[in-house]
């Protein structure tokens, strides 16, 4: 089976007309959830994906609300709760130089310019102006690393290694 990537987790239904509430786990929700695009639903206890075509998309608070072609009522989408939406690898678009997909960054080892290993990136937060990488060290403590030029000095996705310059107070 072709490699697939998570783009969202379904957390609930919304209203009565077949909308679902999604927490996006993709770098580009506006692109991934465009009307007419295809996503694949993996229900909670299922290994077989269901192909879905997006009929509508809108933002509501911190969620993306989606509707799919052929599904017009809450009774048709309730089963999707706790499901995961994915796309096929072929649906990924080319990025500009020094741009990366989340899945390329998550799992990378972070080291300082002094050679100290800080841990592995386990999650990427998108609070606003810049992304923030969650790095879990051997001590199981999480460190937050901002993805800014002053901190991130080198990204090698082939070797899964990222080098950072530790600014004063960054790891306190």
UniProtKB/Swiss-Prot annotation:
Pfam short name (any one): RimM
SUPFAM superfamilies: PRC-barrel domain, Translation proteins
GO cellular component: cytoplasm; ribosome
Any GO MF annotation of the entry: ribosome binding
Keyword Cell division attributed: no
Keyword Translocase: no
UniProt keyword list: Chaperone, Cytoplasm, Ribosome biogenesis, rRNA processing
Domain PRC barrel: 97-170
A Gene Ontology biological process term: ribosomal small subunit biogenesis
Residues annotated as signal peptide: none
Principal location class: cytoplasm
Intracellular or extracellular location(s): Cytoplasm
Domain notes: The PRC barrel domain binds ribosomal protein uS19.
Family: Belongs to the RimM family.
Complex formation: Binds ribosomal protein uS19.
Physiological role: An accessory protein needed during the final step in the assembly of 30S ribosomal subunit, possibly for assembly of the head region. Essential for efficient processing of 16S rRNA. May be needed both before and after RbfA during the maturation of 16S rRNA. It has affinity for free ribosomal 30S subunits but not for 70S ribosomes.
Name of protein: Ribosome maturation factor RimM
Organism from which the protein derives: Listeria innocua serovar 6a (strain ATCC BAA-680 / CLIP 11262)
């Amino acid at each position: 089976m072709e490699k697939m990537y998570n783009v969202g987790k379904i957390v609930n239904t919304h209203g009565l007309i077949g909308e679902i509430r999604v927490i996006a786990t993709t770098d580009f929700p506006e692109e991934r959830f465009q009307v007419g695009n295809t996503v694949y639903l993996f229900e909670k206890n299922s290994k077989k994906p269901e192909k879905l075509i997006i009929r509508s998309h809108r933002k509501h608070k911190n969620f993306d609300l989606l509707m799919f072609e052929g599904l017009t009522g809450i009774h048709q989408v309730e089963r999707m709760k706790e499901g995961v939406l994915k796309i096929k690898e072929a649906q990924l678009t080319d990025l500009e130089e020094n741009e990366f997909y989340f899945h390329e960054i998550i799992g990378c080892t972070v080291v300082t310019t002094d050679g100290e290993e800080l841990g592995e990136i386990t999650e990427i937060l998108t609070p606003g102006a810049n992304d923030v990488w969650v790095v879990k060290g051997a001590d199981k403590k999480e460190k937050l690393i901002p993805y800014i030029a002053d901190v991130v000095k080198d990204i090698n996705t082939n070797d899964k290694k990222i080098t950072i310059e530790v600014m004063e107070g960054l790891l306190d």
